[in-house]
Amino acid sequence: MGEVKHLQINYKTDELFADFREFGNKNLYMIEELKGQMIDASSDSPFYGIFVGNKLVARMALLDKGEVEETYFPNSNYYILLWKLEVLDTYQRRGYAKQLLNFAKENKKPIKAIARNNSKAFFLTQGFKDVATKNPEGHDILIWNP
């Protein structure tokens, strides 16, 4: 299995994400986010991925939130928003999502995730807790504490 790599934001990033647009949820495309960040090549990329050969097969964004999330993490000044965890169809069920999630957990900060595309059961098996609340789009909110 490949290692998790920090993805830089540059002209190639859109090419790397092209396969995800062909099958995925349009809310996960990251097009506008990329365009906004490509302007400043020095910006710190929140994107991480796993390659098989030269092909990006799994990706996610980790957004470090500095404000206190009183509702879910009252004892923490920082948490991570795990955003857009996605694995290409032909590479699913091979452990790539779990590998990305374990990479996020290595930060030893609380994590907040939104369960989209029937991913709630996966997050629950990985130690996340259902907070019995939905985001404005109707997706379940899950949290993980170190």
Curated annotation (Swiss-Prot):
Q: Which residues form the N-acetyltransferase domain?
A: 7-146
For the keyword Transferase, the answer is yes
What are the UniProt keywords, alphabetically? Acyltransferase, Transferase
User: EC number(s) of the enzyme?
Assistant: 2.3.1.-
Molecular-function GO terms, alphabetical: acyltransferase activity, transferring groups other than amino-acyl groups
Question: According to the UniProt record, what class of enzyme is this?
Answer: transferase
Xref: InterPro entries = Acyl_CoA_acyltransferase (IPR016181), GNAT_dom (IPR000182), YlbP (IPR017274)
HAMAP family documented for this protein: Acetyltransf_YlbP (MF_00824)
Kindly provide the name given to this protein in its UniProt entry.
Uncharacterized N-acetyltransferase SERP0741
